[in-house]
């Protein structure tokens, strides 16, 4: 299983960013603040809906935070397109700021649920001996938090 396409609309610094991804390797390079982490966070948000529904049917994934909505906009939308053994499927997730109308903007997570059900059925059918998707995510805030203010030894 791999991501074919990821689309960020009004998400953080991106107004409308469709990304066609390679099935083998994708490298994101850029200066600080250009959106590399936003792309990875958007992927993590979208894949969390599948991962959580594999664990528990109907479970929710990570929502788009109101702070993720682009400044000056009333809503944000993320869409993901995946491919698994030649079958393409996807879902989208929307968030509207408080006080704004949700008209014409809705999350559609049917294929996340259907895919999770298929994976759950495979796990049950093969007594847990089945390959399942692996999603690894390391956020930016992984820095060392405890740095001594003084040096204790002479160098």
Language-model regions, residue ranges each:
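P-loop NTPase switch/coupling surface
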Residues: 1-155
């Amino acid at each position: 299983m791999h991501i074919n396409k990821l689309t960020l609309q009004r998400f953080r610094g991106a107004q409308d960013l469709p990304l066609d991804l390679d099935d083998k390797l994708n490298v994101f390079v850029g200066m600080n603040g250009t959106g590399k982490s936003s792309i990875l966070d958007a992927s993590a948000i979208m894949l969390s809906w599948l991962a959580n529904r594999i664990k528990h049917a109907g479970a929710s994934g990570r929502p788009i935070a109101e702070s993720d909505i682009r400044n000056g906009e009333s809503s944000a939308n993320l869409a993901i397109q995946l491919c698994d053994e030649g079958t393409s499927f996807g879902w989208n997730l929307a968030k509207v700021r408080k006080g704004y109308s949700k008209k014409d903007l809705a999350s559609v997570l049917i294929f996340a649920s259907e895919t999770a059900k298929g994976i759950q059925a495979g796990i049950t059918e093969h007594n847990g001996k089945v390959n399942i998707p692996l999603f690894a995510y390391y956020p930016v805030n992984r820095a060392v938090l405890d740095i001594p203010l003084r040096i204790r030894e002479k160098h």
